[in-house]
Amino acid sequence: QVEWETEMEIIEIGKGRMVCEGDDIAILSIGHIGNYVTKAIKKLNKEKIFPSHYDMRFVKPIDQELLHKILKKYKFILTVEDGCVMGGFGSAVLEFMAENNYTNSVQRLGIPDRIVEHGSQDELYSECYYDDEAIYDFCNKMLDHQGSKYEELVI
């Protein structure tokens, strides 16, 4: 596992990084929402679920080399962004998949396509269902995707 908070370093434009390696599902995040992913992963690890976490860092240019590696390795992909889901990071991942004929199961978390009221970050993340609890829930439901509970979570 890579330390999430590190000293300043030069970041290559268009290159993401693996934050922690697992086998069950890949969680791709962009920006500070990755801190919530880290919290969710700690909870999932206690239940013997070991997701990989990738900090993609850039939407444009998106790290195509890293996406190829991720999509070849994992059946289940969860994208998490503190931005609009429609036309955002998750959409960029889906476009990349379509252009390259990938058929992985993908769920996108972020701000839904509706008006969101005011509140603290934690309140809004919870209301929009992309806080650490939502990330935890979606990982569980995607891995148990044949159950009816998965359909209830799809936004």
Identify what each model region corresponds to.
Residues 1-155:
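Thiamine diphosphate
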